[in-house]
Amino acid sequence: MKVDVIISADYITDDIVKDKVVVVIDMFRATSVITTAINNGCQKVIPYLTVEETLEEAKKYDKSEVILGGERRAVKIEGFDLSNSPLEYTEKVVKNKTVLMTTTNGTRALTKCLPGKKIIIAAMINAEAVAKKLLEFNDDIVIVNAGTNGEFSMDDYICGGYIINTMLKEKSNIELTDISKTSNMIYESNKDIINYVKEARHYSVMRSLKLDNDIKYCIKKSIVDVVPIYDGDKIIKL
């Protein structure tokens, strides 16, 4: 069992993810949104690359069945029902609904991971549940950090480290690449999370948009026991 880490969506190639269990992380905030929505009874989440595609697909549904969610540059998209705040995806809003979603980084990363054997959605809020499931799979793993506009993102990296750290507590003989070892070490040295992620560029962007409550929620550790999986068409509860 080997664990590798990809530092942003720009570095995803078919040969890296092919036949691997792929774990996609966009902690601030797409994968936190998806995990929250699925946990709150959302029937499925369907990710799209573009706003136009999302709006076009929405026409195929009855308006009472579907919710449009997402962002561009961390801001709600005009004409959409919800932004990319996980706090908006309450049980009252999403239960039994289909969420059509497009985001700047997260949905792009998901689309590029399609050659993977399985595609798991992870965030800080469900990290332990994901780690447990990965150990059950006992396959080679690639943790994909969505990153920010193609660049490395500190928040995704420490989240991956938390997952690796949790796995190592149960299975010590996992083979780690240098970059996955470093991810684990970063988490080991920064278990309070906030003092680390506050140095991240995306954290500053969120603070400037007054998204402090989203930050507080997204850095909570393993408060959700659900593992969403993407089958190339839709994201559902595993």
UniProtKB/Swiss-Prot annotation:
- Record NCBIfam families: PRK00886.1-4 (NF002055)
**Out of the domains of life, which is the source?**
Bacteria
Q: Does the keyword Zinc-finger apply?
A: no
Question: Which cofactor is recorded for it?
Answer: Mg(2+)
InterPro entries hit by this protein: ComB-like, ComB-like_sf
EC annotation? Answer: 3.1.3.71
HAMAP family cross-referenced by the UniProt entry: ComB
The disulfides recorded in the entry are none
The record's top EC class is hydrolase
Q: Indicate what this protein is called per its UniProt record.
A: Probable 2-phosphosulfolactate phosphatase
Q: Which UniProt keywords apply?
A: Hydrolase, Magnesium
Member of which family?
A: Belongs to the ComB family.
Q: List, in alphabetical order, the Gene Ontology terms for molecular function in this entry.
A: 2-phosphosulfolactate phosphatase activity; magnesium ion binding; sulfopyruvate decarboxylase activity
What catalytic activity is recorded?
(2R)-O-phospho-3-sulfolactate + H2O = (2R)-3-sulfolactate + phosphate
